[in-house]
Amino acid sequence: MWLIVGLGNPGETYARTRHNIGFRVVTELAQRHHLRFTHKRAKAEIAEGEIAGQRVALALPQTYMNLSGQAVVGLRQWYKIDPATELLVVYDDVDLPFGVLRLRERGSAGTHNGMRSIVALLGSQVFPRLRIGIDRPPVAWNLADYVLARFTPEQEAQLPEVTRRAADALELVLREGIVVAMNRINAPPPKPEKKRGSETSDPSAESADHAGGG
């Protein structure tokens, strides 16, 4: 089975903040498959069911962001999963442009306190994660204030599309596996076709590394 955890802060005060986009995406996935958050265990709200032929538990930790690891470790023990192959964490990332998705099998927690808590309590960085870009804060902004603020009106208008693509990415992992999903999700967007008669570019001049950071 898969344990899919969306990171965020509980309560209406934080519901529409940048830091809660992980909650939004996992909630979108649950609604899409008519799964309801009817269980509470290990300091998290849980929706259980089946997606793409896989048993899943979708989790929204209720611990506040900085203590997310408490919920994840408790759920790992409850469901008896292997984090390296059966845990997928969804969260916001200030180091990615708004709306950009990155899927990884492992990596550091970076500056994200929720991920730091998970890595510390699991004792491992080896577990899949889907990062969703929320942009860097403006120079004058404190990072904590930025992630706990709402999106701009322009970004808010694009959020339904961003959450849809992120939920699609989670479905792809469940349907095709993490490696196939990474190859598709992390690939650069296709370049526009050149007009007939224009010079072709030298493919050797293009970088082969599109993976980005951990």
UniProtKB/Swiss-Prot annotation:
Residues 184-214 are annotated as: Disordered. InterPro entries: Pept_tRNA_hydro (IPR001328), Pept_tRNA_hydro_CS (IPR018171), Pept_tRNA_hydro_sf (IPR036416). GO terms for molecular function: peptidyl-tRNA hydrolase activity; tRNA binding. Keywords: Cytoplasm, Hydrolase, RNA-binding, tRNA-binding. Its EC number is 3.1.1.29. One of its GO terms (biological process) is rescue of stalled ribosome. It is found in: Cytoplasm. It holds the Pfam family Pept_tRNA_hydro. TRNA binds at Y14, Y64, N66, N113. Its main location: cytoplasm. Hydrolyzes ribosome-free peptidyl-tRNAs (with 1 or more amino acids incorporated), which drop off the ribosome during protein synthesis, or as a result of ribosome stalling. Catalyzes the release of premature peptidyl moieties from peptidyl-tRNA molecules trapped in stalled 50S ribosomal subunits, and thus maintains levels of free tRNAs and 50S ribosomes. HAMAP family: Pept_tRNA_hydro_bact (MF_00083). PANTHER family: PEPTIDYL-TRNA HYDROLASE (PTHR17224:SF1). Belongs to the PTH family. This is Peptidyl-tRNA hydrolase. The lineage of its organism: Bacteria, Bacillati, Chloroflexota, Chloroflexia, Chloroflexales.
